[in-house]
Amino acid sequence: MNREITYEDLNKLNYCGAIIKEVSRLMPTVSVLFRVSAKPDEIAGYKFLANTQFFINVPAIQMHPSHWNQPEKFDPDRFMDSEQQIPKNALLHFGGGARVCMGKQLAILQLKALMVLLYRKYDVELMDMSGGIKYSSTVVNHCEELPVKIKVKHSA
């Protein structure tokens, strides 16, 4: 397929969307979300005053076994199964609630387009399938090294 990719095409790529969610679940872009309580509240027996600062540990939520079956396993299919309920706020790859990232839908479309354009013209393989990914885990996480082999696909 050599034609231009359309918005409609990208919206049909459900498995690409599942891959994006699963990669983001296992390796979130941010490790911590910050929130401030608007009013006094009680959660699980603990009382919090208004203006209490909360630091939300994103990897802990996204890897918690009460939210995910086999949380350490890369499994995009977990997002394809309409029967499997993902608990609210168990996936925070773009934040959540009133402060969810405004660019979420655009970013997902761009990632899908990147996947299509890359894999349309190239074969991409990890150099070491058993090796881990070298990344820096700070407030904003990023990959430091990921050796890959890229080959141009030849047209038939």
What are these language model-derived features?
Residues 80, 87, 104-141:
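Cytochrome P450 heme-binding "Cys pocket" and the immediately downstream C-terminal segment
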Residues 58, 111, 148-150:
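Hydrophobic, repeat-rich solenoid/adaptor surfaces of innate immune receptors and signaling proteins
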Residues 2-44, 65:
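Conserved cytochrome P450 K-helix E-x-x-R motif and the immediately C-terminal K′/meander segment
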Residues 10, 56-83:
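Conserved cytochrome P450 K-helix/beta-meander segment immediately N-terminal to the heme-binding cysteine loop
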Residues 6-14, 45, 99-105, 136-138:
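Conserved, non-catalytic sequence blocks in retroelement Pol enzymes and Pol-derived host proteins
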Residues 53, 138-156:
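C-terminal helix/juxtamembrane-tail motif
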